[in-house]
Amino acid sequence: MTRQKSVLRQIALRLPEIASFCCAALMLCVIPLYFDDAFFNINRCKVSLIRTATPWLLALMAVSLCASRLPGEKKRLERPIAPDICMAAFLLACVIACARQGFSEDVTEAANGRNLGLWLMLCLCAAYYIVALGEIDGRLLAACMLLCAAICAGLGILNAAGIDPLGFYQNIKRKLKITFFSTIGNADFFGTYLLMMFGMA
């Protein structure tokens, strides 16, 4: 019985790390490679996945943090570091900018702006803090980044050479191909995604 309690205790203490790893895997390995059949819908499908998954991951992290604070455990919260503060300041700036526009659908959803609205920013910020709170090994994060970057780059090189193993560029006009980066999507989405995930580095 004592051994079972010890195992459960260890699992409970590792829950934040597990939740953090799930979020990191989604954001760093799944999102860049995820796309659907409609090429011009690539940003929309990525945004939809982020907005669907992030609230659940945030809830999982909240439950994990509560479960990890077992009786007798005195786990001290780490002081925020520069990227944490910068991300919070950026999020505050986004909220203030949207508030000045009355939180209209154009700024929250941004359906006419490649769906890069406030809701996406909130989800990406939440993902950053979920990963930060889990305190997972930085080497693991770097490995996830490099793995996905290598796959995206490899696909991009193949596409540029006229090889399209995923049928990614079918029916796309030649002049439009240069605005997309492999499976990462349109340059606008790539810039936003890179900015928000840069803090993880």
PLM features per residue range, with description:
Residues 16-24, 80-93, 129-157:
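Interfacial loop-to-transmembrane-helix boundary motif in multi-pass membrane proteins
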Residues 1-14:
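Short, Lys/Arg-rich, polar N-terminal cytosolic tail immediately upstream
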Residues 12, 16-19, 64:
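Generic L/I/V-rich hydrophobic alpha-helical segments across diverse proteins
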Residues 27, 31-32, 51-71, 94, ...:
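Central hydrophobic cores of alpha-helical transmembrane segments in multi-pass inner-membrane proteins
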Residues 86, 185-200:
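Alpha-helical transmembrane segments at the extracellular/periplasmic loop-to-helix junctions
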Residues 120-127, 146-153, 194-198:
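Membrane-embedded alpha-helical core segments of multi-pass
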Residues 31-56, 76-81, 93-123, 133-136, ...:
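Interfacial transmembrane-helix termini
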